[in-house]
């Protein structure tokens, strides 16, 4: 089976990111083909099981000129709370993810 996992957060940070990474590992052990779309900062590194296709959405760039989105008031990395996004930021966010998702599928 081909599985695409998507998160706007960093894949190796926070509970949901670690959960995503471990889920991808479990799917890989079962022989499934994995791909991941995730938000990352310019200096982030990622490690997934061999054969996993990774499609990063780069924050802190001209296209997304703010830190990775986060779901909590306090994250273990510099982040942008969804509730603090302006309409322009939300549009940039949606556009960036749409472009990467089209490549992934």
Question: Predicted regions: what is each one?
Answer:
Residues 1-58:
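N-terminal subdomain of nucleotide-sugar transferases
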Residues 35-104:
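A conserved catalytic-core segment of Leloir-type glycosyltransferases
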Residues 23, 27, 100-105:
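Hydrophobic, Leu/Ile/Phe/Ala-enriched alpha-helical segments that form helix-helix packing faces
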């Amino acid at each position: 089976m081909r599985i695409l996992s998507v998160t706007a957060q960093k894949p190796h940070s926070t509970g949901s990111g670690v959960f995503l990474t471990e889920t991808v590992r479990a799917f890989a052990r079962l022989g499934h083909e994995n791909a991941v779309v995730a938000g990352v900062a310019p200096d982030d590194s990622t490690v997934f099981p061999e054969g996993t296709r990774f499609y990063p959405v780069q924050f802190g760039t001209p296209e997304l000129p703010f830190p990775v989105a986060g779901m909590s008031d306090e994250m273990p990395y510099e982040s942008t709370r969804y509730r603090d996004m302006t309409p322009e930021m939300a549009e940039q966010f949606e556009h960036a993810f749409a472009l990467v998702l089209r490549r992934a599928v």
